Amino acid sequence: MLNKQSLTVAIVSVLCCAGVQVDGAKPAKGGGGGSHIQRGIQLAQEKHYDAAADEFGKAIKDNPKDPRGYANRGTAYRQAARTAIEAGDSEGASTRYQAALADFAKYIELAPKDASGYTEHGQTLSELKQYDAALADFNKALELKPDDIFTVKFRGFAEIGLNQWDKAVADFSAVIQKKQDDLQSYDRRALAYRSMKNYDAAIADYTFLITKNPNDMEATTKRGYTYSLAQQYQNAIADYQAELKVNPQDNDTFQRMQYAQSMLAAKNASPSPTPPIPSPTPEEEKRLMDKISPLYIGIGVLALLIIAVIVRLLTRGKAEPSSHRIR
């Protein structure tokens, strides 16, 4: 969903920059710059982004002070970077991203009061996961143009990258309020809600997406996972089963369903109580001592009698000592 929409935004950005005078920019001088821009737009629409960047470069050569050329070429470079990523060319993607950043920086230099330059620069930084720097660009753009919902949305992406869930919810909610058909904002807001453990709100957003498109298995699976986190395992299993009916080879969803099934079984199982081991009460202890005390007393008396007999036997037959005193 994100890649497709990003592609659309990129092409629209090219068209807008080419056809509209940028705030604070001087009108382009006459010459061949316009034809190169039109040719670049055509190539971009045909997804020949590197060739489009070359055409925009020719337009820049003809009119080096026109910020539109840098904006267009930066957009083409960025889209070429995305294409390189899809092809597994990380080095090529990095080179194109850096070229895009340089062009958008030049765009800002030539038109510092144009919010679009900061938005484009920030979006590129965000794709490079440099979220703090991207956030600064988006905030600057919104200072210049507070009602730009596209910038608000891009800022929401950066806030998700920084785990600023509450701020992301606020930004995506602002976008939805103005553009209720922006399904991507519902999806991202649901992620932020889920990360905040506001599972009911996340489930509501995923349910809205499913209502709009019942065949959206991605939203169905995400809702199932959210149900599982909320310990609503039966609902989670139903969503996972719906996904597996369409994509039976989805091993990840199958494993999640097995987990939900095991948790549901454990939740429904009635635990067998273990009988406690009784401990003697004070009364029982007293009765025990009552039984033991006479026994101890009897043993003691018998021992004394035996000692007395032994002493008597030992002293029998001995002469009693006589007194030497004359009587």
Feature roles, as predicted:
Residues 41, 75, 82, 123, ...:
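Residue-level recognition of tetratricopeptide repeat
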Residues 317-327:
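Cytoplasmic C-terminal tails of single-pass
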Residues 33-34, 67-68, 115-116, 149-150, ...:
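Helix-start (N-cap) detector for alpha-helical repeat units in TPR-like alpha-solenoids
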Residues 58-59, 106-107, 140-141, 174-175, ...:
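Canonical positions in the second alpha-helix
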Residues 45-46, 79-82, 86, 127, ...:
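Register position in tetratricopeptide repeats
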